[in-house]
Amino acid sequence: MSSRADREKEAQKKWNRYLVAVLIVIIICVVSYVNFVEPFIERTEDQCRKDGVVSIETAFIIDATDHFSESQAERINLEVKDIIESAEIDERFTVYVLDNKFSEANSKNPHIIVCNPGDGQGKSEFTNNIRRLNKNWDEKFYSQITSTIENLVGEGRANQSPILEMIEFASINTMSKSKAKSKRMILISDMLHHNKEYSHYTSSHDFEEFK
């Protein structure tokens, strides 16, 4: 009788150990899954996060009133591509264009605004469609910016080039409103301001007056 009770106790102990082992495995699997699978991030059509998170705020100002040589345009396009390819995930890019329509009200609005959703690098192939992520990155982010700038950097000509006004406008409407911890403004211009109030091409105006 005692032997039978001992056997039953031993069997119960084994069963308890088995349950504990199974429970440990389940806990490990759950923890691994939570750490392995990234939370889903909702994005708008411009690939920016719906929760408003922006890692870096970057503003391009393209002076389309400038005349760039073929070699200068090629250098600019290569530099822009390097910047875009090294962009951080959730970095937001706003492209402003300064052209001969600057005096018109809507000409100061951004040409495009788009965020970097990531190209799939560093993500697991088991939980992500890397090819789809890369295609989305190329079509909705990379090509959006590079093609825009390639089309704008060329044979621009205009009677005015109010670059300082555009810098001020971008600073107020993009930089000051952004909650990003890091911000930068990238200018593609000869930086020669020219309008009736002030011109770098002449010395007849007082810069302090313009300010």
Annotate each PLM feature:
Residues R49-G52, I84-A87, N173-K179:
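Surface-exposed acidic, glycine-flexible loop patches that form ligand/cofactor-binding
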Residues V53-A180, R184-I186:
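Von Willebrand factor
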Residues D63-A64, A170, S182-K196:
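DG-centered beta-turn motif at the end of beta-strands
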Residues R75-D82, E168, D206-K211:
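N-terminal post-signal-peptidase region of extra-cytosolic proteins
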Residues L192-K211:
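VWA/integrin I-like adhesion module and closely mimicked acidic/polar interface patches used
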